[in-house]
């Protein structure tokens, strides 16, 4: 068997999570058009008869304005260490800017084999010129690929090239395991994804979701109590909505998706609470939203 570790890096909203979902063949990571959707380092496992590839999704590398952002960037940088391959994912519609220049420097420092992946080519025309520009600025790529998750272009070719790079090794995870996070983390992420779907402006960035309780009840019902944290009372009002309608929408869509992954009926009990300026409080970031193990 050939097995190994692959880290995806890029600016926020470059499509890293969508690429991993395409590799795995099903949705294992939340996706959103909102930047900085991914906050944690998340490992997703692809397994076939001859390969096991552990893909690490990372927060987008950006210029942070809160302590949360600082930790997210630190997580992304550390995820490039000790892996077999790095995929530098570039949004074809954004071009080669300061985030890409910074990531190029980090890629060079990692001294790890790196593929350049120009993603979202269905939305841009000059993506081949963009690739040439990046290669001329950062001559550290062993291969260049052009992909579109929406049109399923270049995905299989990229996956095959990744397989070819994997060294001989053991099966690190059970063959039916798709993600290295507990079900409570996955549920919290699903709820946060629905908040991102229904809200705009500053709300997506100030939301954290914590699963407080999970317990099996009669008739195989899974009871889940979760809290959506925001920073201000005005944000709390937006998420609850008029007559509670926004929270009901978030809860309904979340429950349907949670039921699909746990295989049973779910009672989802959602609450919204205010934790002022939580994005600048280290204890909350490290312990309550689970970044402590990722940066040590």
UniProtKB/Swiss-Prot annotation:
Record region (G1): 10-17
Compartments where found: Cytoplasm; Cell inner membrane
Cellular component GO terms held in the UniProt record: cytosol; plasma membrane
Membrane topology: Peripheral membrane protein
Source organism superkingdom: Bacteria
Region described as G5: 147-149
Region annotated G4, chain positions: 119-122
GO MF annotation: an example: small ribosomal subunit rRNA binding
Gene Ontology biological-process annotations: ribosomal small subunit assembly
Location, primary (coarse class): cytoplasm
Record HAMAP family: GTPase_Era
Role, per record: An essential GTPase that binds both GDP and GTP, with rapid nucleotide exchange. Plays a role in 16S rRNA processing and 30S ribosomal subunit biogenesis and possibly also in cell cycle regulation and energy metabolism.
Assembly behavior: Monomer.
Protein's UniProt name: GTPase Era
């Amino acid at each position: 068997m050939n097995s190994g570790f692959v880290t995806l890096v890029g600016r926020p909203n470059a499509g890293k999570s969508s690429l991993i979902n395409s590799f795995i063949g099903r949705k294992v990571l939340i996706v959103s058009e909102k930047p900085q959707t991914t906050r944690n380092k998340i490992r997703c496992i692809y397994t076939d008869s001859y390969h096991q590839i552990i893909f690490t999704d990372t927060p987008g590398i950006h210029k942070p304005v809160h302590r949360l952002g600082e930790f997210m960037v630190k997580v992304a940088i550390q995820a490039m260490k000790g892996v077999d391959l790095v995929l530098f994912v570039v949004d074809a519609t954004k071009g080669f800017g300061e985030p890409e220049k910074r990531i190029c420097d980090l890629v060079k420092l990692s001294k790890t084999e790196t593929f350049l992946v120009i993603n979202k080519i269905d939305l841009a025309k000059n993506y081949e010129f963009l690739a040439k520009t990046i290669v001329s600025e950062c001559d550290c790529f062993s291969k260049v690929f052009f992909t579109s998750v929406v049109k399923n272009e270049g995905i299989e070719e990229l996956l095959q090239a990744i397989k070819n790079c994997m060294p001989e090794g053991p099966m690190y995870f059970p063959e039916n395991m798709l993600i290295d996070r507990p079900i409570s983390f996955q549920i919290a992420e699903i709820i946060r994804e629905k908040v991102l779907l229904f809200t705009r402006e500053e709300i997506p960035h100030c939301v954290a979701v914590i699963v407080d309780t999970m317990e099996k009840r009669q008739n195989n019902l899974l009871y889940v109590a979760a809290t959506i944290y925001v920073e201000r009372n005005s944000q709390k009002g937006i998420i609850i909505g008029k007559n509670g309608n926004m929270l009901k929408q978030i809860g309904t869509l979340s429950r349907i998706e949670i039921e699909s992954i746990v295989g049973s009926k779910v009672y989802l009990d959602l609450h919204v609470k205010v934790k002022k300026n939580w994005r600048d409080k280290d204890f909350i970031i490290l312990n309550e939203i689970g970044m402590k193990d990722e940066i040590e």
